[in-house]
């Protein structure tokens, strides 16, 4: 299905507590320098813009491959560059495999780290050490985002695109941040998205939209795609930076 992802940078205000534009720019430069090759591959295989993958890495971990919800280096279920939870990642990969959505390159990279599938489409459990591997963490994080986008663009799920085939990035960010999607492969209910229903037929003003989310989700969205946020920087100041 063809769709466009809107990346608005106007109408949102930066949270007072977040770093300066200069500091965030340096973080993005470091992420692209250190992991640009992996981001480029993940982008090509998942069809998710490299800028979006990079921004997720920035928001989730600041580019620290050992970042953990319980402290750097600890073996928390949520760990690594894109902070996905290994407790549900096995089922995520098995769904992709059974649906024949894993590309040859994705399978090769997974196999490189010992993640293969048996005749029934089953694979091994994902470990803490797997999450610390930058290439693998970025690839799997992008696969999770790809599944989420597929769900959000399915007209049979009640999350259909609007008439302009516009995929709202706020939805992707909110569901990924909440960790609701990966557990089941299904988006639960709109009422659970930031605590309020989200209008799927009208693209609201983003200030009004983000104002309806809880503070954690609001700050996450602001940092990702607000004024002076990661996507603002990546699509302007760093738009010519080369990945890989």
Label every PLM stretch briefly:
Residues 17-20, 32:
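A short alpha-helix capping/helix-coil boundary motif
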Residues 24-25, 50:
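N-terminal low-complexity, intrinsically disordered targeting/assembly segments enriched
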């Amino acid at each position: 299905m063809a769709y466009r992802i809107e990346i608005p940078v106007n109408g949102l205000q930066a949270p007072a507590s977040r770093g300066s534009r200069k500091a965030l720019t340096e973080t993005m430069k470091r992420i692209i320098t250190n992991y640009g090759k992996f981001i480029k591959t993940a982008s090509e295989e998942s069809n998710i813009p490299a800028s979006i993958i990079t921004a997720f890495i920035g928001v989730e971990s600041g580019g620290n491959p050992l970042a953990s919800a319980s402290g750097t280096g600890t073996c928390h279920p949520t760990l690594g560059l894109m902070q996905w939870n290994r407790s549900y990642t096995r089922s995520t990969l098995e769904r992709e495999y059974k649906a024949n959505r894993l590309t040859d390159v994705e399978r090769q990279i997974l196999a490189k780290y010992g993640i293969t599938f048996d005749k029934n489409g089953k694979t091994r459990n994902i470990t803490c050490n797997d999450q610390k591997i930058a290439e693998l963490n970025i690839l799997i994080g992008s696969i999770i985002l790809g599944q989420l986008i597929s769900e959000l663009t399915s007209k049979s799920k009640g999350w259909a695109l609007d008439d302009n085939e516009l995929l709202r990035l706020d939805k992707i960010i909110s569901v990924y941040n909440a960790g609701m999607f990966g557990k089941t492969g299904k988006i639960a209910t709109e009422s659970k998205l930031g605590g309020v229903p989200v209008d799927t037929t009208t693209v609201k003003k983003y200030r009004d939209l983000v104002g309806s989310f809880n503070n954690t989700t609001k700050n996450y969205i602001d940092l990702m795609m607000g004024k002076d946020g990661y996507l603002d920087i990546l699509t302007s100041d760093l738009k010519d930076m080369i990945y890989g």
